[in-house]
């Protein structure tokens, strides 16, 4: 076999974790030049003999998606062609479908979906609440500068509570009466000295954290009544809230903050670092140094990996659990301008989404560094924020004054979202 040209045959075992698509566990001799298309034909022919209908598969060879010829993939991994190769096949994740375009009056810099609602924040200083079917419910004034981040605290049929942060140096706590469709600002959270770019609510909904251009990380009570010590009677009466904890360690703006668990926070910064904070000790637990300013970061509770978005068009993957956290596990190539926003799926271990100044969203599998699974098109200008908190919807906001809503697989499979 002339392996230099990828000619001849390779012995492979075809495996799947989806038992209903399993084929006989025997070695198969296939041509070294096969691609995903030919492997699909081969596996479907085997399944057809079992009475199965045609299915689109993707193929993993040594934990990475096959994106070209098998022989080229093996050479790149320095795998001997004489070895029996295990190829795992998985049902291809279906392309998300565009559902809605929600028109705003200014740039949409913050989005967060929960249940049947979508919360947005804009550069005209307003918040907006929409249904996930595209109906506008409420416009909420209050901030005096562009809004940079939003997050839901709690939500049920009667009441919604959420937090917003802004370039006006504040975060604001809100309570929404769903039935009456009225909103009250519960507290104005003051303590930062520059704009507040990021906000994240704790898993139990009792606290939230903010990151700012003043380089500080602050933790606040998210309770309706802030009974903490040190809050003056005058501040309580005026609705002003002060932070419970202030943590210093970054040298430049904190662009991302996320709760990893009830007592651990992740931050990303323009100072090229990720930091993991232990709130019980009120200090830094771990630090990951990168070589680029971090515009956004996302931690997955499913796989414990961290993604970063940066100005060099690339996304990077880090492992927070190792002593070699600063070593890049993978780099994802596909955007043509700086990547502003990234988020892991909350239900699919390997999937994440990103949004970029190239006007595009992309859906990725972390095992496919060379290309995204899909481009999610629709924005006419820069993408500023993306959210996949609700497994049914990928939601993004942009400088084209729109929010784009895409149905994900969960919504497509359940067929619950016809207008």
From Swiss-Prot:
Residues covered by region (Ubiquitin-like (UBL) domain): 10-91
Keyword Thylakoid: no
GO MF term set: ribonucleoprotein complex binding
Subcellular location: Nucleus, Nucleolus; Nucleus, Nucleoplasm
PROSITE patterns xref list: WD_REPEATS_1, WD_REPEATS_2, WD_REPEATS_REGION
Keyword Membrane on entry: no
A GO-annotated cellular component: preribosome, large subunit precursor
GO biological process, one term: maturation of LSU-rRNA from tricistronic rRNA transcript (SSU-rRNA, 5.8S rRNA, LSU-rRNA)
InterPro entries cross-referenced by the UniProt entry: G-protein_beta_WD-40_rep, NLE, WD40/YVTN_repeat-like_dom_sf, WD40_repeat_CS, WD40_repeat_dom_sf, WD40_rpt, WDR12/Ytm1
SMART domains per the UniProt record, alphabetical: WD40
Record's keyword terms, sorted: Nucleus, Repeat, Ribosome biogenesis, rRNA processing, WD repeat
Per-repeat ranges for WD: 103-141, 142-184, 191-230, 249-287, 289-328, 334-374, 378-416
Main location: nucleus
Family: Belongs to the WD repeat WDR12/YTM1 family.
Function: Required for maturation of ribosomal RNAs and formation of the large ribosomal subunit.
HAMAP family documented for this protein: WDR12
Name of this chain's protein: Ribosome biogenesis protein WDR12 homolog
Lineage of origin: Eukaryota, Metazoa, Ecdysozoa, Arthropoda, Hexapoda
